């Protein structure tokens, strides 16, 4: 059976350890947000008794939940959640003790989050992870991928029914081996292009055009991947990446 070592602090403020089986559930103590303050930037040699000596003479008996955090490649950070007795005005404690020099360190005192605030913060983080990265879309341009490498402006113009000058290929970036200079090819593209539609009528739209050309095939039978382009002036950066360039015709 796998085991893990858990750190605790005894009644004298000294660190002790115990060994518990893996997957053993350790009941977490629920903090009362109306009676608890966060105390941060504690000295590395701070112990529970030091905190009792700091707070109890003025605010009565306290309960200390000492924790420590050690970010990678950063100094050890020590902080604690201190729970006061009923009737203690946390606002006054914070006003008096926040920024106080304690064992040569300037401590930071903050209120802890309420259940509602924790729930809201958790939902916000979850939404940021799951929400799609919505971007404004163009009203007259399609972005097309999977284009045969030998395709020309005229080839795509024939498929999409636009003027060849409205076809902008994303050009390949090449390196001149003699000079090591980077340049953009006039001959080779990346298989991507922007198709601009002029004067879309009231009964037409770029969304309709996108649906119309979904699944359309090139002359060699390859299926073109079509979507609405992002509404950015420099669409090359949006769709083509850093190593490409749109060839303006």
Swiss-Prot record:
Q: Which organism is it from?
A: Saccharomyces cerevisiae (strain ATCC 204508 / S288c) (Baker's yeast)
Q: InterPro entries from the entry?
A: Nucleotide-bd_a/b_plait_sf, RBD_domain_sf, RRM_dom, RRT5_SRSF_SR
Tell me which UniProt keywords the record has, alphabetically.
Repeat, RNA-binding
A biological process (GO) annotation for this entry?
ribosome biogenesis
Spans traversing the lipid bilayer:
none
What range(s) does the RRM domain occupy? Answer: 35-114, 140-231
Its name, as the record gives it, is Ribonucleoprotein 1
Q: Name one GO molecular function term.
A: RNA binding
Pfam families hit by this protein: RRM_1
Q: Does the keyword Nucleus apply?
A: no
Keyword RNA-binding listed? The answer is: yes
A single Gene Ontology CC term: ribonucleoprotein complex
The record, for Gene3D superfamilies, names: 3.30.70.330
